[in-house]
Amino acid sequence: MTEQALLLVNLGSPASTEVADVRRYLNQFLMDPYVVDLPWPLRRLLVSMILIKRPEQSAHAYASIWWPEGSPLVVLSRRLQEAVKPHWTKGPVELAMRYGEPSIEGALKRLAGQGITQVALAPLYPQFADSTTTTVIQEARRVIREHGLDLKLSILQPFYDQPEYLDALVASAMPHLQQGFDHLLLSFHGLPERHLHKSDPTGAHCLKGDDCCQRAEGAVLATCYRAQCIRTAEGFATRAGLRRDQWSVSFQSRLGRAKWIEPYTETRLDELAEQGVKKLLVMCPAFVSDCIETLEEIGDRGREQFIEAGGQELVLVPCLNTHEDWVQALVQLCSRAPQAL
């Protein structure tokens, strides 16, 4: 029987909190044309400007959440890899990061060197976006093509509405929901609006009306990040038995001056405090592993902002990380990954 390896891929992290390492990581991340979708000269100019001050600022943020073992995202991803191994009986389980180490190139070369010819590629992003899902797939294909590797890929599809994923979200969040709260904010990573327009296959649906995400279906839904985030939130809330007035959706991590998808998390934190919310739960379902965007942006800065605006307590619900239900769900989802053309 032919072995099939499983390659789990997450976003990545600097090698350390040193400014030089953070600058190197940010340069690789921001120079990805799927992330900053500008022509190369403009992208290089913009990234060079960002790299003047941002590495020092980001290094401080990383240092505030860094663990003795290293980057929380990388550590938690490795723990997930180890948790999955006993359940993936088809072959070895590798871990890679799209940016930084361990790299996709290194992982695929190791698998090819072991005589593996079939790989289930698992971008660990529940919702589709070119800046996450597509760039992982294209990087894997680049490595295979440029190094002449005899590898055939099966690719985990976005799983934003899959019952296994939603049930795992509910199971992981339920202990916090049961402790009582005034409101639940489901904060997803944001994207520039132009990314949604570019991924709309019709060129005439995304952001055309307040209910465009509710009306999205078929090919439009398959590539609309915002619509998929809303479907995740609705599926979670239904399974968790929440009333519609108990939760809302927002989008975080806005960068630069371009318009990003709304509502913004930083705006919602102030609004909810002003509306009298005292105990706020925040979940970040676009991330399966806790990282700087959850631990520092929400858990530290977001909490401080909410309390300064009049709230009393912000509870960050941990990501799925290595929750048993998530491990089982991930294995089931990857087992169904279709072979790429």
From Swiss-Prot:
Disulphides: none
Family: Belongs to the ferrochelatase family.
Gene Ontology terms, MF aspect: ferrochelatase activity; metal ion binding
Full protein name: Ferrochelatase
Keyword Cytoplasm: yes
Keywords: Cytoplasm, Heme biosynthesis, Iron, Lyase, Metal-binding, Porphyrin biosynthesis
Compartmental location: Cytoplasm
Main location: cytoplasm
GO biological process: heme biosynthetic process
The protein's annotated pathway: Porphyrin-containing compound metabolism; protoheme biosynthesis; protoheme from protoporphyrin-IX: step 1/1
Residues holding Fe cation: H189, E293
UniProt entry tagged with the keyword Protease: no
Catalytic activity annotation: heme b + 2 H(+) = protoporphyrin IX + Fe(2+)
GO cellular component, one term: cytoplasm
Role this protein plays: Catalyzes the ferrous insertion into protoporphyrin IX.
EC number: 4.98.1.1
